[in-house]
Amino acid sequence: MSTNFRGQEKEVKELLAQVEFSYPLLAPRVGAMKQHDVKDADKISFTTIDLDKGSVTPSLMHPEMTEINHINAGTKTFGFRPYLLGLNYRVSHLQAETDTSGVISAAVRELSVMFDTQTILGTALNKGMISTKSAENPFYDVLAEDTTLKAAATTEAKIAALKALFLKIEDEFATKNSARSIDIYYWGDQLTAIFNGNNVATDSTILAVARQVFTIPVSFVKLPKLALQSKYINAAKANALPADNGMVAVDPASVRVDYVQLPAPTASGSNEESEYDWYKMRTGSVSVLPIRDAGIVLQTVNFAG
């Protein structure tokens, strides 16, 4: 019979209920979530409708009409590679009282950061929010980096330069998309300093400039710096950032997020013969795909000395 020196034995359900999901995932904000079973297929394919907008010419309908105009539409096929990533944890029955739920919470947090890394950057198998290969998806726009911000310029001058970039982004959404609102995610130390270094009560702030430029509500969201560290990029086998600073504008209504498993503890049990409890934590692949024109618009930003 096994000996257990832990003062308080926790039932599995009780233990898992104590796990803290302390890292808020980015994916639910980015687009509509669609879960897949990893057992379904090696690759899940799906199609989107590419409407020829020039063919949308409605006919005037009257009793003598003999023909109604038809629209033209093609399809685009995209793929999602489903796979699981996992961690296991064992606790010996001979071990003194340990904070098992704390250990599992910390592990789930690490998996959550890596899930964000994949959501943002993508991998060799699946696309993320930031992709420089726009030719593979006609709904993903990569704007040319034709504006260089002087690193030594005043904050006002930098904001004025950013206004030109905002105008480009606004033009993309205005001419290609009917978004009701967009989120602009930004990254990079120099760009973050501009966003964070302003008093929101003045007219020269980023928010004030955005209100002047955008005709729809816009929110600015800093990409989690933790998820962009090389440690997590390497662990998640994610793609590299295309630039040190940049912005990616997203219309959540025009984006789908395919995934297999959100980071969480998924199973647990006890091996009485070997006298240990075991716990499994799992996460899985994720893909971010714009499904309408200008669903995602990327704009990198260059700072010169």
Residue ranges, per PLM feature:
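Terminal, non-catalytic protein-protein interaction segments that mediate quaternary/complex assembly
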Residues: 63-74, 125-135, 236, 240-243, ...
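A short, structural micro-pattern
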Residues: 81-83, 178, 214, 273
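A contiguous, surface-oriented mixed alpha/beta subdomain in the mid-to-C-terminal portion of proteins
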Residues: 136, 140-225
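Assembly/oligomerization interface modules of large self-assembling protein complexes
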Residues: 14-87
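N-terminal compositionally biased, intrinsically disordered segments and leader/signal-like regions
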Residues: 48-49, 58, 67, 133, ...
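Alpha-helical scaffold segments that mediate packing/assembly in large oligomeric complexes
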Residues: 91-168
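Sequence/fold signature of self-assembling virion shell proteins
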Residues: 2-20, 24-29, 37-47, 195-305
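Helix N-cap / beta->alpha transition motif
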Residues: 85, 90-95, 184-190, 251, ...
